Design a protein with these regions (language model features):
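Sec/Tat signal peptide C-region and signal peptidase I cleavage site
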Residues: 21-27
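Short, glycine-/small- and polar/acidic-enriched structural segments
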Residues: 28-132
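Bacterial N-terminal signal peptides that target proteins for export
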Residues: 1-13, 19
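Cleavable N-terminal signal peptides
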Residues: 14-15, 25
Length: 132
């Protein structure tokens, strides 16, 4: 079998293009989800990490029945430390975070535009997933 420089170049370019296309397809399927928690020395941060691990299923991970991730296909969730409830609500409302832990009073104040959120537009799109 004889190889030419042009043939090797063409094969190399084809391999790079194929790899690039495959990587682009995987990258397009990825979804990221952030969970605002609390300080790293407190309870909410590790709880957020457990939730993030439970809902994540990165591409290439083992199947659920083989001991791998059982979460949402293509999702990479991460717990992010924060200064707490007010910080988490503000981060969600600004689009910086997808979700976050918040005390019920802070969530209520954000929803109604009262309390520590007095003077701000009521966050009528804010939703509760669970009470801690």
């Amino acid at each position: 079998m004889t190889f030419t420089i042009q043939g090797l170049k063409a094969a190399a370019i084809g391999a790079v293009l194929a790899t690039g296309l495959a990587t682009a397809a995987v990258a397009q399927d990825l979804k990221f989800f952030t969970i605002g928690t609390g300080g790293t020395a407190y309870t909410y941060y590790p709880v957020g990490g457990v939730i993030a691990n439970a809902i994540s299923k990165p591409p290439g991970s083992r199947e659920c029945d083989a001991g791998g991730s059982c979460g949402v296909e293509g999702l990479i969730a991460s717990a992010v430390s924060s200064r707490g409830s007010v910080d988490n609500v503000n981060a969600i409302l600004s689009g910086l975070r997808n979700s976050g832990f918040a005390q019920s009073d802070v969530a209520y104040w954000a929803y109604t535009g009262t309390g520590t959120m007095d003077g701000k537009e009521p966050a009528k799109d804010l939703r509760t997933i669970a009470a801690l």
